[in-house]
Swiss-Prot record:
Annotated compartments: Nucleus
Region (Disordered): 24-55, 561-596, 665-689, 718-740
Protein's name according to its UniProt entry: Conidiophore development regulator abaB
DNA-binding span(s): 120-194
GO CC aspect terms: nucleus; transcription regulator complex
Organism of derivation: Aspergillus oryzae (strain ATCC 42149 / RIB 40)
Keywords: Activator, Conidiation, Nucleus, Sporulation, Transcription, Transcription regulation
Biased composition (Low complexity): 582-591
PANTHER family: PROTEIN SCALLOPED (PTHR11834:SF0), TRANSCRIPTIONAL ENHANCER FACTOR TEF RELATED (PTHR11834)
Primary localisation category: nucleus
Entry similarity comment: Belongs to the TEC1 family.
């Protein structure tokens, strides 16, 4: 057949369930975009097999069938267009929004391909995609005015000068009036005659329309509404995404792979009934059921700037097992279109397409996979959706239903199945990167991935089981995230040492966890991460900058004497991020004392290992890998909210090690089948989705700055994929008991991690006043250029000291040099 075959995975049906990862491979033919999982057909039940019994096989694969659907404008593109009409100098009657049909002309697309090949002195195209889009926005904002000039800022400007100025304000890159004029002439040579182009480059006749008010002049936007160059990139050009087709069906042996000829259809995309976009906040409990999306919206360094699609699938289950040799097929196809380049081939726009799949049961992650997607040659892209995992689940559900019916408890089995699908959710994240020839590494958004990859779309999945009289259908709708969500600032609750500040955004996000009281046990690092998202969360949670109540204590000068060791706070102490969770007792002590005569220095709460339930149909265990240089045989599971084992943490602190982790994890022993632990001597594989944690050793502490330390790399731990955090019990697995490590009572060397800043300084008073004046003058110049009103100025004056404090922490905390720490302390002391 002339269809694209997807990878086929052979699964057992005699035992009516699929087992864990095995040796039988899933072969993927060329030009296929499907699963790369490996499964075995080990029996799960002790069924009696006759001599004529043989394994009945189900072949699962991803199959894609395009189904046209109506395209809708995203809220992001709407906001970009809305910016063009803001801040007009005169009253203006805006007519209906006109499109840019000329952007999809083949002549224009060919011209753009040619433009990307030529570069100027800085190695970039003269008219890159960013500048090209700004150029067309400038044409919209500055209507044709013939040979007349426009007066602004006491000078006269022609239209080409206004366009050049507009481009500079929008992108931070200068293009001269001559370059703008030349570009207009080139485009006009092959776009002349197009109505949308004509209205942008030529004046309309005076009697063109008696119902429209004559245009007063170009749209001049104040700098506060102009996107700065640091925030403008191709990330602001949100791609339009629509679901072309989706289906999940079973094909009988020797039957075509089309869904219309299916033996059974679990669900398929409903056609001809497009759903209106829905605000994300109207999606019930989305933070609980889609943890990955919640983390993306709270990310500051790589903010979410893509469309979000919600697919609600109603699944019609089978009453019996399919015939031998049947195939489970899943087809998911999207259309991803660049708003500037229209229907240009995707091969010219992006490369290195990847898809991350996350499956959750009751909000707990049970599966995380990573797939490389073949490079598309059109705007259509086909995505894998874990067909092997679904085949396993469907087989188990059918078997459970048959067993319940045989025992007369079919109603209970039905309720279990319905509850399973109600709590089952999934998230798919599609990413791609620019071609190497178009990457502008020096102009990338701060904090973006080093490979230049960008999120193209986020797909959310909800599932339900159909009623007896229903058929399986899937509906697709777009979700609208509140604008400015990722830029919100959460400040600590007020106390004696803090000032209450209202959130900057008019649509605040309620935190997923209740706001901690300042009179509870300290949870200071959570305040830093949740209430101060404007700087990257530190890998080391420093407690020396907080008072005993757990709040910020920057209002008073730090003048503690160096010899007052009992008043210092240990910067290496680890705090419990989830004190409200039920704690489990262990054999290890919950605190470590410096000496019998001194106050207790290091308080480490006993943190339990999480036991995440995987539901009725959990996946098999996957092992973690330890690098060859690791002195400690432990790994960190990357599965959701979890604490750190207190006993293991104390052991690490005894060895004078500090854990540097980019996310909350679980310290547990690596398990392998056969009763042996991974000793860390071999690292046979480390996939594309491997995570790395580093250990650092504390050395050469200084006496300047807050918790200033010099950290040397000690080693690293590698972890591949997500696994259940509870090690399986039973024969074939080693015991989870850790050998007891003798407790060491001498912890005086840990006390050296604390640092008290000395108030002495070599800067004279005159120099200090000059620095303060220079900083204040620069800030005032930046703010006054925005021309804010009195209310905005009052708000800025309230927020600015706190922002300076956060900036000081970002500059000086764990800084590599003394200069950075001095800058931190200087700004902190003089920010008022």
């Amino acid at each position: 057949m002339a269809t694209e075959r997807q990878p086929e995975c052979i699964m057992s049906q005699t035992q009516h369930c699929l087992e864990s990862l095995g040796a039988q491979s899933c072969q993927e033919p060329p030009n296929a975009s499907g699963d790369t999982q490996q499964y075995s057909n080990n029996p799960a039940h002790n069924d009696t097999a006759g001599p004529d019994d043989h394994l009945q096989q189900i072949t699962c694969k991803d199959r894609h069938s395009p189904v046209p659907n109506h395209s809708q404008l995203s809220i992001h593109r709407y906001q970009v267009k809305k910016l063009r009409r803001l801040q007009s100098n005169g009253s203006r009657l805006a007519g209906p929004q006109r499109g840019r049909s000329y952007l999809k002309l083949q002549s224009f697309l060919d011209y753009r391909v040619q433009q990307r090949r030529g570069t100027c002195k800085d190695g970039e195209p003269v008219w890159s995609d960013e500048l090209e889009d700004a150029f067309h926005q400038a044409l919209e904002a500055n209507p044709p005015m013939g040979r007349r000039n426009w007066s602004a800022r006491g000078e006269s400007y022609g239209r080409n000068e206004l366009i050049a100025d507009y481009i500079y304000r929008l992108t931070g890159k200068r293009r001269t009036r001559t370059q703008v004029s030349s570009h207009l002439q080139v485009l006009d040579s092959f776009l002349k005659g197009d109505p949308d182009w004509e209205r942008l480059v030529r004046e309309q006749p005076a009697d063109h329309s008696n119902s429209q008010t004559q245009l007063v002049g170009p749209t001049r936007r104040s700098p506060i509404n102009c996107l700065s160059s640091s925030h403008y990139s191709k990330d602001s050009l949100v791609c339009a995404v629509q679901c072309l087709g989706f289906g999940m069906w079973v094909s009988a042996p020797n039957m075509p792979d089309r869904i219309d000829d299916a033996f059974h259809v679990y669900t398929r995309l409903r056609r001809g009934q497009p759903q209106a976009p829905m605000p994300l906040e109207e999606l019930t409990n989305w933070r609980t059921f889609f943890p990955h999306l919640n983390s993306l919206l709270l990310e500051v360094n790589d903010p979410l700037s893509c469309e979000i699609i919600l697919l609600e699938a109603r699944l019609q289950l089978m009453d019996v097992h399919p015939p031998t040799g049947s195939r489970l097929e899943i087809g998911l196809e999207l259309d991803i279109t660049n708003p500037t380049l229209g229907a240009a081939p995707m091969s010219n726009q992006r490369e290195n397409w990847t898809c991350y799949n996350y499956i959750y049961e009751e909000g707990q992650k049970t599966m995380e996979t990573y797939h490389n997607i073949p490079k598309p040659h059109t705007t259509r892209i086909r995505l894998p959706f874990e067909s092997s995992w679904w085949a396993e689940r469907f087989t188990m559900l059918t078997e459970d239903k048959q067993v319940a019916e045989a025992s007369g408890h079919q109603h209970a089995a039905k309720e279990r199945n319905q509850q399973f699908f109600r709590t089952l959710t999934a998230v798919q994240e599609i990413r791609a990167s620019e071609p190497a020839s178009l990457r502008r590494l020096h102009n990338q958004y701060a904090g973006s991935p080093s490979d230049g990859s960008k999120r193209m779309a986020i797909i959310l999945w909800q599932f339900r089981q159909t009623l007896p009289i229903e058929v399986g259908t899937t509906i697709c709708r777009k979700l609208i995230a509140a604008p400015g969500r990722t830029n919100e600032i959460y400040l600590p609750t007020p106390d004696l040492d803090s000032v209450r500040l209202t959130p900057l955004s008019s649509d605040p996000i309620p935190p997923s966890r209740s706001t901690p009281s300042m009179y509870q046990s300290p949870r200071t690092h959570e305040l830093l991460q949740q209430h101060w998202p404007l700087y990257q969360p530190s890998h080391h949670h420093v407690t020396s900058v907080f008072n005993s109540a757990g709040a910020f204590d920057f209002t008073n000068s730090i003048t503690k004497p160096e010899e007052s060791l009992s008043d210092k706070t240990n910067s290496a102490s680890m705090l419990d991020p989830f004190p409200n969770l039920q704690q489990q007792t262990t054999s290890q002590p919950t605190s470590l004392d410096v000496s019998s005569g001194a106050p207790r220095m290091l308080q480490i709460p006993d943190l339990p290992l999480p036991h995440t339930g995987l539901g009725a149909y959990g996946l098999g265990h996957e092992s973690h890998l330890i690098g060859p240089d690791e002195p400690v045989g432990s790994t960190v599971g990357m599965s959701g909210d979890a604490g750190m084992n207190g006993a293991r943490l104390e052991t690490l602190l005894e060895d004078d090690l500090r854990v540097t982790a980019t996310s909350q994890g679980t310290v547990l022993q690596d398990w392998q089948q056969g009763g042996s632990k991974n000793s860390g001597k071999k690292n046979p594989r480390a996939g594309d989705d491997a995570h790395t944690l580093e250990f650092t050793q504390t050395r050469a502490f200084t006496d300047s700055g807050y918790a200033s330390t010099k950290l040397d790399n000690y080693g690293h731990i590698q972890s591949t994929r997500d696994i259940p955090t509870e090690p399986p019990a039973g024969p074939g697995y080693a015991s989870g008991e850790q050998p007891e490590v003798p407790q060491t009572q001498n912890f005086v060397h840990v006390d050296a991690a604390r640092t008290v800043y000395s108030d002495t300084s070599s800067v004279t008073s005159l120099q200090r006043e000059g620095y303060i004046s220079e900083l204040a003058g620069d800030l005032f110049t930046k703010v006054s250029s925005w021309q804010p009103d009195s209310m905005t100025m009052e708000r800025i004056s309230e927020v600015l000291p706190e922002l300076l404090r956060a900036f000081a922490l970002k500059v000086g905390h764990n800084a590599p040099s003394q200069m950075h720490r001095d800058v931190m302390v200087f700004i902190h002391k003089n920010r008022e």
